[in-house]
Amino acid sequence: MEPNDDDVLPDSLDDCLARAALASASGLSRGMLRLIVEVFVPELFDPLSGAMMANEGDQMKYWNMTRAYCQRLQSLTEGTVRVVYPDAGVAAMLSSQWGEGNFTFGSLNDRKPFDAEEDDLVVIACPDPQGVDEVIKISRDAEEQAATAAPGDDKTMPPV
């Protein structure tokens, strides 16, 4: 008997983020170098009207989702996670609000958005269209550094 669609869907947003982190960790453990994780929340995006995070507080809801995902991913991989946000203002605000945790913060417009010596995994959170070139550059740089890492070096986790 095949499961119904409702049987395989997550029961909650928290369950969805946990499943996404587990799937990401599984892909990383199998040697995948690039992963894309998309979580669509109808309250934050209306594909019919095109309105994206139109209500007050919507962006903070999204940032909190990225925090939950990254915390779960870090606990599953036990690596150092760098979360790269679209701009330095967001990265600074979240770093201040959340304090020191299991991951560090960066922004797409940083001179050095990640440090291959210190960061095991790079998560680029909600890049905007203006940041596409930076996302491509970060992805390529991280992949090159992972590919040139010495065998047995734990610093081989790429951007998610």
Question: What are these regions, as identified by a protein language model?
Answer:
Residues 2-134, 141-146:
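Positively charged, amphipathic N-terminal segments that serve as targeting/anchoring signals
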Residues 26-27, 150-154:
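A general structural signal for short secondary-structure junctions and capping/turn motifs
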Residues 137-140, 160:
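Accessory regions outside conserved functional cores
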Residues 144-147, 154-159:
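A short helix->loop->beta-strand "cap" motif at the edges of active sites that frequently abuts
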